[in-house]
C-alpha cells in the first residue's frame, strides 16, 4: 500500500474508490498498484 498526496490509476485494472472518506486505488491485476491518499 502506497500512501501518496495524489493517487492515479496505474493500469487499466486500477479502480479509484472512496472508503471512510479516503480516496484509494485498488487493482485486481497487480496488488503493487494499491494506493491511499493522505498521511
Curated annotation (Swiss-Prot):
One of the record's GO molecular function terms: structural constituent of ribosome
InterPro entries: Ribosomal_bL36, Ribosomal_bL36_sp
GO cellular component, one term: ribosome
Residues annotated as transmembrane: none
A GO BP entry: translation
Keywords: Ribonucleoprotein, Ribosomal protein
Cited Pfam families: Ribosomal_L36 (PF00444)
Family the UniProt entry places it in: Belongs to the bacterial ribosomal protein bL36 family.
HAMAP family assigned to the protein according to its UniProt record, in alphabetical order: Ribosomal_bL36
Full protein name: Large ribosomal subunit protein bL36
Amino acid at each position: 500500500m502506497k500512501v501518496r498526496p495524489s493517487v492515479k490509476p496505474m493500469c487499466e485494472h486500477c479502480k479509484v474508490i472512496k472508503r471512510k472518506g479516503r480516496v484509494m486505488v485498488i487493482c485486481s491485476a497487480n496488488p503493487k498498484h494499491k494506493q491511499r491518499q493522505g498521511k
